[in-house]
Amino acid sequence: MSRNRYERGWVLAALLALGTAAAGGAEKPLAFAYRSFWPEFEAMRQFKDAGVNTVCIFAANTANSLGQPYCKYPPVWRWFGKYDFASLDKQFDDVLAVNPSANFICMVDLNSPSWLDHQLALQGHSGESDSFTMLSCACANPAWRKATGEYLAAVVKHMEARYGDRVLAYLLAGGQTDEWMDYSRGVAGRAKAQAWKAWLKAHGRAEQPVPALERLDRAAFENFLRDPATERDVLDYAQFTGDVIVDTVLGFAAQTRALIPQQRQIGMFFGYILQLTHSRLVWGGHLEYERLYASTNIDFFISPGTYSDRPMGGGSGFMVPNGTRVLNGKGFLHEIDHRTPTYNVKLDGFVSIAWMVPWKDQAETDAGLKREFALATINGSSLWCFDMWGGVFKTPETMRVVAQGKKLWERFGAQPLAGRAEVALVVDPQSARYVNDLHPLVKEIYQGTRNKLNRLGAPFEVFSFNDLARVDLSPYKLVVFPGLFEVTPEKAALLKARVCKAGRTVLFVYAPGISDGSTLDPARIQELTGTAFKKPGVSVAQRDGWTAAYAASYADVTPQALKKLAAAAGVTLYCDDEVPVFASGQLVAIHLAQGGVKTITLPVACREVRELYTGRVVPVQGKQFPYTFATPDTALFEMVP
């Protein structure tokens, strides 16, 4: 495909998605659901009693990252064109025996069974069909795509014929941990090398070999950022790696869409730019998420709550840019796979996952689950409680919180609640390709900045740079760019026209605009920010009516520094403490590790607030009210006019 045809297709998809967003925003939440790798029937009964009737079934054919089978049932995909549908049916029928009212999210395992990997190797595709660890190599392999597409079609047709409208959605799962992550780190076999040549031709680039692997592990500028003047092939290869995965996923999504009725949804794990760090930010394959988010064949995306900010006092958060998916009219499913003190750590007599640190006690479990439920409910997101290998939701106290969370989600989750954020975090996948993702600073760019904003004491939203051309930026008084390394002339014009406006504060961190898309030049940093590259601390300069804040070091971007900038910009700080706040419409959630009496400030006047888990009503005076929090605690307030 020519570059122009590719760009026209992407723009058309974006316009179609924008039309969906303009017509009514993101998809309504699909479900409050239950999921486990293993058939935890007693837990399913407890969730049924709590009003949860949607169950995710993962009829896996493959092993997990620990080498253990995902599934307790026999594999479904047994050979080319040979399927054990009796095993598939039993997994759904066993749930129906426990809960005759159950409906399903059907997760389709598109990873390679060991027999397929071995057979394709014998056909000359050695190392090019292990989709779990070498995803981009498998996606570039026509033989793998053909066999996998045939399996996908067989499963979907069978499910539609046997279970019909009990299926709410199909989840297309592949790659490392079935989250479409690529662990090949740039390795290319014959098929991927041929696909690279085709990609270069389609993008108007001269033919060149796959970059040497040792070049992928270093970068020209401070061993952190790549210079497009000398490393353009590496930047292109990073985009190609993501493109070959996205092209494959788009093909599977279109194939599935053609086999199901319109009301059935399609979802997948993708777009983890706020989570992936060491060796995965660039080479994990998720940076090309914008093409998937613009697809009319995909209805929603999924991620676990972030793994890096789960303890008490942390803000959790989606791994994907929430503002981008909303702008594209997509739904979201928040995976609550957080560990409680009762979770099962032993997969068998030899393998355990005890290194996964759980919440410490029932008080932390209650506060943590309320935090996760509030995050999903306030953002109009679906969710599932992921029981993994059992025992996570074991106590009656835990299930009482689940039942309460389900009722509140049903009441508020499907309402079109207007966001309350006055702070925007902007990620830029095009700039992220510049990063040497083996550098220790990589974890500070997006994951680290998001975790610090989690302690702002005010809500914030996350957008992608390309969203800035069409999102309404008027509510945002502070805009944060922690990784805007590439500022082309087109990007510079967009910043000037839409972002750097009178009355707004814009924070740039570490080398913003150092590249214009062709070369690196540190002098460009001062041109953009008014401050020299290496000046320590957070510098503030007035620039034509707007305020440019600049931090040369990620270490200077502390929660305290962010709160100071936000307050100076006029952002409503709901709490003086460094705590997470979620807010939209009439809902405000505040989570604390250490309780006590706190004064809460609201963005709008109201008569009183009602804490929805306890029913406690507190009067509001001058947009403020006192509230006594437990240790730890999450409170979900409804503002009463």
Regions found by a protein language model. Name each.
Residues W10-G19:
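Bacterial N-terminal signal peptides
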Residues M1-V11:
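Bacterial N-terminal signal peptides that target proteins for export
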